[in-house]
């Protein structure tokens, strides 16, 4: 799959989607994007900057949601032009999709909305690459149906429907907890789409702090290494210069000053894993 000027897939080098959970300001976005671009460049790692203009599914209505679509897209457009990186953001309604698509390079659909047929079709109908997050409640094999909806929407709008990614972000494990089943990464290859692993939301403790979600960021490297060892196309990580001060999802964000070393490990591991055919593909 062609994605933002590079090839994405299990037979291609790992790519990175990373950035703060939510836009916290124009200069903040430009600075974090610049640091991430520099890290990725040193590692030869294809990179897409991620940040949200609105967090529509916060635990509490008192939590910071973001700058809103107009101001948020203006900031993302400046990041794209000034820093020189492709940008990704999530949309929450069908009506938002065309406006967001006019600015960003990749659209993302929230995990909670993966079963919403009209929404999935509308986002794919923009013709932009789409990163579809698998719901915490969904079996990995059920993503076949979600991808079929997206392709239907894209093809009805005159596009080929071949610019879709699927993203694992953990499965509900009792209350206020998630677990990652690495088999799901292999199962979702059956969609024919590049598989992305979200290493930070997978350590989230949904609603675990009462009015906000908790997280166990110490397990981000553990799960990221496991996913890359399984064999994936891309890794997704939310990062922040000081996660304890982040306005959204701080407990599961990986510290930006510690990111380079983790990425370096993942790049080396990815090269090793992809240097030979995956054994399971021979069965």
UniProtKB/Swiss-Prot annotation:
Gene3D superfamilies: Aldolase class I (3.20.20.70)
Source domain of life: Bacteria
NCBIfam families noted in UniProt: KDO8P_synth, PRK05198.1
Catalytic activity field: D-arabinose 5-phosphate + phosphoenolpyruvate + H2O = 3-deoxy-alpha-D-manno-2-octulosonate-8-phosphate + phosphate
EC identifiers of the protein: 2.5.1.55
Gene symbol of the encoding locus: kdsA
This protein's GO CC annotations: cytoplasm
Pfam families: DAHP_synth_1
Keywords carried by this UniProt record: Cytoplasm, Lipopolysaccharide biosynthesis, Transferase
Stated family: Belongs to the KdsA family.
Protein's cellular compartments: Cytoplasm
UniProt name for this protein: 2-dehydro-3-deoxyphosphooctonate aldolase
Pathway in which this enzyme or protein is active: Carbohydrate biosynthesis; 3-deoxy-D-manno-octulosonate biosynthesis; 3-deoxy-D-manno-octulosonate from D-ribulose 5-phosphate: step 2/3; Bacterial outer membrane biogenesis; lipopolysaccharide biosynthesis
Organism lineage string: Bacteria, Pseudomonadati, Pseudomonadota, Betaproteobacteria, Neisseriales
A GO term for molecular function: 3-deoxy-8-phosphooctulonate synthase activity
InterPro entries: Aldolase_TIM, DAHP1/KDSA, KDO8P_synthase
Primary localization class, coarse: cytoplasm
Class in the EC hierarchy, top level: transferase
Biological process per Gene Ontology, one example term: keto-3-deoxy-D-manno-octulosonic acid biosynthetic process
């Amino acid at each position: 799959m062609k994605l933002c000027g590079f090839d994405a897939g299990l037979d291609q080098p790992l790519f990175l989607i990373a950035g703060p959970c939510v836009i916290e300001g124009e200069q903040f976005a430009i600075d974090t994007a610049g640091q991430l671009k520099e890290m990725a460049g040193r590692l030869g790692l294809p990179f897409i900057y991620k940040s949200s203009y609105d967090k529509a599914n916060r635990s509490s209505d008192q939590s910071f949601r973001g700058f809103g679509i107009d101001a948020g897209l203006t900031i993302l457009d400046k990041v794209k032009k000034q820093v020189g990186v492709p940008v990704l953001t999530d949309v929450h309604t069908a009506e938002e999709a065309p406006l967001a698509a006019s600015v960003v390079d990749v659209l993302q659909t929230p995990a909670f909305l993966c079963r919403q047929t009209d929404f999935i079709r509308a986002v794919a109908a923009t013709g932009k690459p789409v990163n579809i997050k698998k719901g915490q409640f969904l079996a990995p094999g059920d993503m076949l149906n979600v991808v079929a909806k997206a392709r239907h929407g894209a093809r009805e709008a005159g596009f080929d429907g071949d610019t879709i990614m699927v993203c694992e972000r953990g499965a509900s494990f009792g209350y206020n907890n998630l677990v990652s089943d690495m088999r799901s990464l292999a199962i979702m290859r059956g969609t024919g789409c590049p598989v992305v692993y979200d290493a930070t939301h997978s350590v989230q403790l949904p609603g675990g702090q009462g009015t906000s979600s908790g997280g166990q960021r110490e397990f981000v490297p553990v799960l990221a290494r496991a996913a890359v060892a399984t064999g994936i196309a891309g890794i997704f990580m939310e990062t922040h210069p000081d996660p304890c001060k982040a306005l959204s999802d701080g407990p599961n964000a990986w510290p930006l000053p510690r990111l380079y070393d983790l990425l370096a490990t993942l790049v080396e591991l990815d090269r090793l894993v992809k240097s030979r055919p995956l054994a399971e593909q021979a069965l």
